[in-house]
Amino acid sequence: MDPELLVSIYASTAVSVGIILAAAGLGSALGWGLICSKYLEGIARQPEMRPQLMGQMLFTGGLMEAFPMIVLGMSMWFIFANPFTGAALAAIGS
């Protein structure tokens, strides 16, 4: 087994995981920005709806924050239990 192949697989996986985590963080930040801006717009239009809007905003934000945590778990799986190394070993017959 060529050690350079394993190094290449792990390096590509690390770069890919970094890109995936950055995209999830960016999506979460943009989502929070949109949710909060719409919340403030709703309060400006109907101030008496503030408690209901706040509850819905926090619930939606909590659901939205679950996505980066799921992505983090999947990324850790790719880093620590890399499925691509086994496939590469099987493909080259080692």
From Swiss-Prot:
Transmembrane regions: 15-35, 61-81
GO cellular component, one term: plasma membrane
PROSITE patterns given in the database record: ATPASE_C
Any one GO MF annotation of this record: proton-transporting ATP synthase activity, rotational mechanism
Keyword Lipid biosynthesis: no
Disulfide bonds: none
Swiss-Prot/TrEMBL site (Reversibly protonated during proton transport) positions: E65
Bilayer disposition of the protein: Multi-pass membrane protein
Subcellular location: Cell inner membrane
Signal peptide span: none
InterPro entries, alphabetized: ATP_synth_csu_bac/chlpt, ATP_synth_F0_csu, ATP_synth_F0_csu_DDCD_BS, ATP_synth_F0_csu_sf, ATPase_proteolipid_c-like_dom, F/V-ATP_Csub_sf
Similarity-based family: Belongs to the ATPase C chain family.
Functional summary from the UniProt entry: F(1)F(0) ATP synthase produces ATP from ADP in the presence of a proton or sodium gradient. F-type ATPases consist of two structural domains, F(1) containing the extramembraneous catalytic core and F(0) containing the membrane proton channel, linked together by a central stalk and a peripheral stalk. During catalysis, ATP synthesis in the catalytic domain of F(1) is coupled via a rotary mechanism of the central stalk subunits to proton translocation.
NCBIfam families with a match to the protein in the record: ATP_synt_c, PRK06876.1
Protein name: ATP synthase subunit c
Organism: Nitrosococcus oceani (strain ATCC 19707 / BCRC 17464 / JCM 30415 / NCIMB 11848 / C-107)
Gene name of the record: atpE
